[in-house]
A protein has these predicted regions:
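Di-metal (Zn2+ and/or Mg2+/Mn2+) metal-binding site signature of metallo-dependent hydrolases
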Residues: 75-97
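Active-site microenvironment of metallo-dependent hydrolases
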Residues: 1-44, 49, 54, 100-107, ...
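Active-site metal-binding motif and surrounding structural segment of the metallo-beta-lactamase
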Residues: 61-77
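Histidine/acidic residue-rich metal-binding segments in metalloenzymes
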Residues: 155-173, 180-244, 253-275, 285-299, ...
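Divalent-metal coordination cores built from histidine and acidic residues
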Residues: 2-18, 22, 72, 98-201, ...
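Active-site beta-loop-alpha junctions enriched in small/polar residues
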Residues: 87, 114-116, 141-148, 174-178, ...
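Residue-level marker for buried hydrophobic side chains located in beta-strands
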Residues: 80-82, 140, 275, 477
Length: 585
């Protein structure tokens, strides 16, 4: 399929430029060009006609006074990078992320649509279609389940089909509801099969999966998985016909060990491997985007040529786009990067659609401006009452036990029922252990709250509130009910975001006014905002990899072992509510 349309006139002109019968629009002269098809560097001229490459070789093109000539001797030319697995709503949004990615050499992205699924389909489609005009080629995947444990009208058979059939949607997934597959959920299996019936790819989500489980996933239609933790996991996926994506994200910085482990296995690098930054939260993007991922791979011992191929040709082939993008060859869209050295993947110049669009990390062209006022992204606040400290007090059960969520790492939580001291009013007291806090999820629509003691998030944390959560429920964490209520009221005032209270004062405020989960602010501002929150939480003793992801995933029902939901604390393995939600007082 065409990634960008080409007119009959431009098509004929491209052929004429290739034959040296018409002048080139752009001539990149004398660069060392990476041939991703053979993994060799060649000193060639690259000749562009409009948006597309017309010629790659040793002969000089026909030029006129309109031809832009780039003297590139001593520089290295590679295709624009492709991010095959983006999550573009981690406080930032698809527009600001694309602008940022373009500055550092990413010219293609395949992105998650989960945060769009609460919108009417017409609005969802309008956003995806508007992004087609961005210099970064943007496609999406269609989610098959809401990842909340709650039914949602966007996830009926009819609505799944409508999303999957959209031309900007080129895969299904990622498949987070594996239990639904094993239980033969009719709607989920329809989505899996319909994705493959359409000839589209299907992304899995199988961390720690056995070879037997991966067999079932492949049989069900999964064609790739980004959840390999060890080199052997990569090999298992490839042996079963999947593509294996090597990940380096803020929550799973696995790439160095994957590379070293693969080298230790002594097997050749595979054309069925890709690289991803997998939706890192803003602070990690201080180091860049796909350029940073490639650099990590090279520093870990991956040959540069292999790293560039995994970030260009391989994802293009996987998604059936390699006749259009992913390589420097005639007929392809002219997305190319000039690098100062082979092992330095941050480009000095970015070319997209045949034009110089960024130089030294600065955008040179206007991109696409979102129309958020035309989308239903205002945070809903159906609460009819002011937050009260009593919402954040927990009584033990009749056996004197209280639910305790233990953070095993940044995203995995295990539930236990423990004896806890109580205060004079019979509420759980946390004064004996500074590492404890209370965590509450507020179901604003249903007027309910789910409460537990939280161990491992930090020390002496008075009050934090967040509308940024996987389920859309509001999360409040702290040791001081007054500060917790204050933080919750503040995020309602700013129409969404994350607020941290200490000694009665706001010490960190991160406004996320779009659906309470993201902002239209530019990436640099979002990165600084995220760094401030992380630094504040580190000062409060948070030791896990990524506290922003920790907050997001407290309500994500695709992760073990216990999660907070609108109906109570759920045991993920059994699907049973083990601690029911309570009404708001």
């Amino acid at each position: 399929m065409r990634v960008r349309a080409i007119s009959d006139r431009d098509y004929l002109n491209m052929i004429r430029v290739s034959r040296r019968q018409a002048p080139a629009s752009l001539w990149i002269k004398g660069a060392s060009v990476l041939n991703v098809y053979t993994k060799e560097w060649q000193e060639h001229h690259v000749v562009v006609a409009g948006e597309r490459i017309a010629y790659v070789g040793e002969k000089e093109p026909l030029v006129d006074d309109q031809t832009v000539i780039m003297e590139a001797a001593g520089q290295y030319l590679v295709p624009g990078y492709i991010e095959p697995h983006a999550h573009p709503f981690q406080w930032y949004n698809p527009y600001t992320l694309a602008d940022f990615a373009l500055q550092t050499g990413t010219t293609g992205m395949v992105s998650d649509s989960l945060m769009l699924m609460h919108l009417p389909f017409s609005q969802r489609a309008a956003i995806m279609d508007s992004l087609a005009a961005h210099p970064v080629k943007q496609f999406f995947w269609g989610r098959l389940d809401p990842q909340t444990g709650k039914a949602h009208p966007s996830f009926t058979k009819e609505n799944l089909a409508r999303m999957l059939e959209h031309p900007r949607v080129i895969q299904g997934g990622e498949l987070t509801n594996w239990g639904g597959v094993l239980q033969e959920d009719e709607t989920l299996l329809f989505g899996l099969k319909h994705t493959r019936d359409l000839g589209k790819r299907m992304e899995g989500h199988h961390p720690g999966a056995s070879y037997e489980t991966l067999n079932i996933a492949a049989a069900a239609g999964v064609t790739a998985c980004h959840e390999a933790i060890h080199a052997e996991d990569l090999l298992s996926r490839i042996r079963l016909g999947m593509y294996a994506t090597l990940r380096h994200s803020s929550i799973r910085p696995d790439l160095p060990e994957l590379v070293k482990g693969w080298l230790a296995l002594g097997v050749p690098w595979s054309s069925r491997m890709m690289l991803t930054s997998d939706g890192s939260t803003p602070p990690m993007h201080r180091d860049g985007f796909m350029n940073s991922t490639i650099r990590v791979a090279i520093e870990a011992g991956m040959p540069p040529e292999e790293a560039y191929v995994m970030a260009t040709l391989n994802p293009a082939v996987y998604y059936g786009l390699d006749a259009e993008i992913g390589g420097i060859a005639p007929g392809r869209i002219a997305d190319m990067l000039l690098l100062p050295a082979i092992d330095q993947p941050t480009p000095s110049i970015v070319i997209a659609n045949g034009q110089r669009v960024a130089e030294k990390g600065t955008l040179l062209v206007p991109t696409v401006q979102p129309q958020w006022d035309e989308a239903s992204v205002r945070l809903a606040d159906p609460l009819k009452k002011q937050a009260h400290p009593d919402w954040f007090r927990l009584r033990p059960d009749e056996d004197g036990k209280a639910p305790v969520l233990q953070m095993l790492n940044a995203v995995i939580t295990r539930l236990s029922l423990e004896d806890m001291p109580v205060d004079q009013d019979g509420y759980v007291s946390l004064h004996h252990d500074p590492q404890l806090a209370l965590i509450a999820t507020i179901d604003a629509t249903g007027g309910k709250r789910t409460l537990a003691v939280l161990r491992g998030f930090g020390e002496q944390l008075e009050g934090l509130a967040s509308t940024y959560s996987a389920s859309g429920d509001w999360i409040v964490i702290g040791r001081d009910p007054q500060a917790m209520a204050q933080a919750l009221e503040r995020i309602r005032e700013i129409k969404g975001g994350v607020v941290l209270i200490d000694e009665g004062k706001i010490i960190c405020e991160c406004p996320l006014p779009l659906a309470g989960k993201f902002t239209s602010a530019p990436m640099e501002e979002v990165i600084s905002m995220g760094e401030n929150l992380v630094n504040q939480l580190r000062s409060k003793g948070h030791v896990h990899l990524d506290p922003i992801y920790s907050i997001l995933f407290f309500t994500a029902t695709h992760l073990p072992y216990a999660r907070l939901t609108a109906t109570g604390i759920v045991d993920i393995k059994s699907g049973q509510i083990v601690v029911p939600a309570l009404p708001l007082p």
